[in-house]
Amino acid sequence: MKNKIWNETVKNNFNNASANYLSYSNIQKHFAEKIVSFLKDLNIQKGECIDLGSGTGLLADEIEREFSTKNITRIDFSKKMLLQNKDSSKKILWDLNNGLPPSIRNCPLMTSNFCIHWLDNPEKIIRDWFNKLKSGGYLIISYPTINSFQEWKQTCQETNIEYSGLTFPVTKDIVKSFNSDEIFFSKKYLYIENFPDVYKLFRSIVNVGAQTNKCKRNKVCELRAIQKFWPKTATNSVNLTWEINIEILKKS
């Protein structure tokens, strides 16, 4: 029951952010472009290519721009996010916590950008996705790791305020069911966002619908303390550091 309530809250927040998502999703755009740069060096077979947790179609559009012969099927559980995709694209409204739609199998390529940390059991789900690839097919995922948001966590420790951000996946857990020869590529990247203050930092998270967490909302006095003790740059602004992992998995 708790998971059901959580998933509904996640979906509602993404629905509410859908209209303005593209204006605020700089980190998602950055790693969508990076995924496309890797695709240029891979021999992707013919067949239906899938973007899982596609949101507004940011990654799918990037792939189609670079590879004009590819039409990417977009799967997401947020109806309003899917409605932001171009009309001509194939879209499937589906909760990925329930596996993949029955029609999805023998795919040459599956991608997922900033999605798996919202799923109930990402390790199992990723393995299921991998099993639906055709031989020689690729699964490419990008996701924030548990090492993200060190400034936030440090500030919460210093102020004795509960950390209210997401707990992101541990990379070794995500790939623990894969053999070394199935892990084609794995690399972590740091990405730093900068904001005038923590209030705008937290607003940026809301702007992309990513504010869902399992903690109580911070009180005003707690937010003030976080603003006061968050490490400052030379210009008195604040940074938020992400660690993003990109995994390319290949089915033999």
Label each PLM-derived region with a short phrase:
Residues 108-122:
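A short SAM/SAH-binding and catalytic strip from SAM-dependent methyltransferases
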Residues 26-46:
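Conserved alpha-helix/loop element of class I SAM-dependent methyltransferases that forms part
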Residues 123-135:
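A short glycine-rich, Lys/Arg-flanked "PGG" loop and its adjoining helix->strand segment in the class I
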Residues 24-27, 56-58, 185-252:
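Conserved Class I S-adenosyl-L-methionine
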Residues 1-18:
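N-terminal, positively charged/glycine-rich alpha-helical extensions of SAM-dependent methyltransferases
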Residues 136-197, 211-220:
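Conserved catalytic/acceptor-binding region of the Class I
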Residues 50-100:
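Class I SAM-dependent methyltransferase SAM/SAH-binding core
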